[in-house]
A protein has these predicted regions:
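Start-transfer (signal-anchor) and selected internal transmembrane alpha helices
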Residues: 1, 15-82
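Transmembrane and membrane-interface helices of multi-pass
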Residues: 63, 77-80, 159, 172-176, ...
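Membrane-proximal lumenal/periplasmic loop motifs of glycosylation machinery
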Residues: 84-93, 104-162, 202
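Multi-pass, polyprenyl lipid-linked donor-dependent membrane glycosyltransferases
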Residues: 94-97, 154, 160, 188-220, ...
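Specific aromatic-rich, kink-prone transmembrane helix
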Residues: 104, 168, 208-228, 240, ...
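Transmembrane-helix motifs of polytopic, lipid-linked glycan transferases
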Residues: 156-177, 215
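Membrane-interface alpha helices of multi-pass inner-membrane proteins
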Residues: 236-251, 262-263, 279
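Perimembrane helix-loop-helix junctions
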Residues: 257-279
């Protein structure tokens, strides 16, 4: 498999001074983004107030409730079905190939990414946690007579997990005062933008981490929104600890994300941590 770099794109490759053209395009996009932020700063409040008075599809509730999150997840999954069928059984990348090779091959293991042989069953170049998960589903496929079935089962579960995480994040925006038309638009985008289900059907560490990180980020925002009060709930605290652990286990940058964000929370909301530790 070959991944083409930016300079190999035909459009830019045929242009003189293509790097200059590329940087000018980036500068133009940056300027447009800054202009958009400036205009939103001037007129954003009025726009939000206007949208807040509108209630498109009154029968559809996009609020932070179990019923709304489940309903949104089901709708998203139904609209993802064509892409799930197209991607059957699943897509994988080279990292996953290496991880599956580790899972099914006893030591010593040749690791193509580093071009060497290791006298070890598993190599932590990619998270071992992910390797065990991916390998277990392919192994399960072997048990029932088809590796494709094992991969497809994993892809379906990851799609459901991703759809639930995205739906929850859209519904959570209600707590932040985001108008319903915007929440509805974001949910529709999640449901119909093809790269999202395509990504969710990929058996790779990045796809798994993405869904975990969405939930971790929502939990982080909830702590900030409540000024630390959310940490007083044992259920919320347990969810936050589990999500933090999954962030660390599913992708190595998750360690740094947790350390930096956790340090901020530990310092800013230390009184809630102390109270929680005493209660435990």
């Amino acid at each position: 498999m070959h991944y083409a770099g930016l300079e190999t794109y035909p459009l830019l490759a045929s242009m003189p001074y293509r790097k200059l053209v590329f940087y000018l395009l980036i500068a133009a996009l940056f300027f447009a983004a800054c202009l958009g932020i400036y205009q939103f700063g001037k007129h954003g409040k009025k726009l939000i107030d206007t949208l807040g008075r509108k209630n498109p599809l009154p029968a559809v509730s996009i609020t932070f409730s179990a019923k709304s999150i489940v309903a949104s997840t089901v709708v998203v999954l139904v609209l993802w079905l064509p892409w799930i069928a197209v991607e059957y059984p699943a897509s994988i990348d080279w990292d996953t190939y290496n991880q599956l090779y580790q899972f099914f091959t006893p030591a010593p293991t040749y690791y193509s990414t580093m071009g060497t042989v290791f006298d070890a069953e598993y190599i932590d170049h990619h998270p071992v946690f992910d390797t065990l998960i991916f390998g277990s589903f392919v192994w399960l496929g072997n048990v029932v007579g088809s590796q494709n079935m094992g991969m497809f089962l994993y892809a379906l579960l990851q799609c459901a997990f991703t759809a639930a995480a995205l739906s929850l994040s859209c519904c959570y925006l209600d707590k932040l005062g985001v108008p319903k038309p915007i929440r509805l638009s974001l949910l529709v985008f999640v449901a119909i933008f093809p790269p999202i289900p395509n990504w969710a059907m990929c058996m790779c560490k990045d796809s798994l981490f993405s869904a975990v990180f969405i939930l971790y980020f929502v939990a982080f925002i909830e702590i900030v929104r409540t000024k630390g009060a959310a940490l007083g709930s044992k259920r919320f605290l347990a969810c936050y600890v589990i999500l933090s652990g999954l962030c660390i286990l599913t992708k190595k940058p998750g360690v740094y994300i947790f350390i930096l964000s956790g340090f901020v929370l530990l310092v800013v909301y230390r009184r809630f941590w102390k109270r929680t530790l005493v209660a435990l």
